[in-house]
Amino acid sequence: MFTENLLFYKEESLIMAFIDTIKERAKADKKTIVLPESMDKRTYEAAEKILKEGIANLVIIGTPEEIEKYGKGYDISGATIVDPFNDPNKQKYIDKFVELRSKKGVTPEMAKEQMEKDYMYYACLMCKCGDADGAVSGACTTGSFGACRIKRISKAIPHKKSPDRQGA
């Protein structure tokens, strides 16, 4: 029993050390991450922790009503809030969406409607246009749901090799 507990403790310590290493690397090269699921309290819980620890710059996509309703009680004052209905960059994202999906018959009206209905598209387009480095979802949707949107929008994003993995 003692040996099992000791092994568990060592595994847990290694995991925590690994997580701490990831956090330190993230802080050293702070990226802008979009959180498109503003209708889940877990988004705000995570955002508050990330902002408090200085791990990343955050963008939360949501209407003022969604932010007020679901984000109440969380300190997200360091995050940028993007209202997908009133964002000054919206037309740029619509144009990019149409450019990428015009062969599939996507019109500006369809792009606008899709972006207002599904914030993951908005997040992907922010990344595609260089306004964010990445997006995290999965609180309200499955991984395959998010991956489908990423594939539709991000297929033309060039792969960046990290400096320590030039041969990868």
Q: How should these model regions be labeled?
A:
Residues 1-15:
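Short, Lys/Arg-enriched N-terminal segments with co-localized hydrophobic residues
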Residues 15-168:
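Anion-binding alpha/beta catalytic cores of soluble intermediary-metabolism enzymes, centered on
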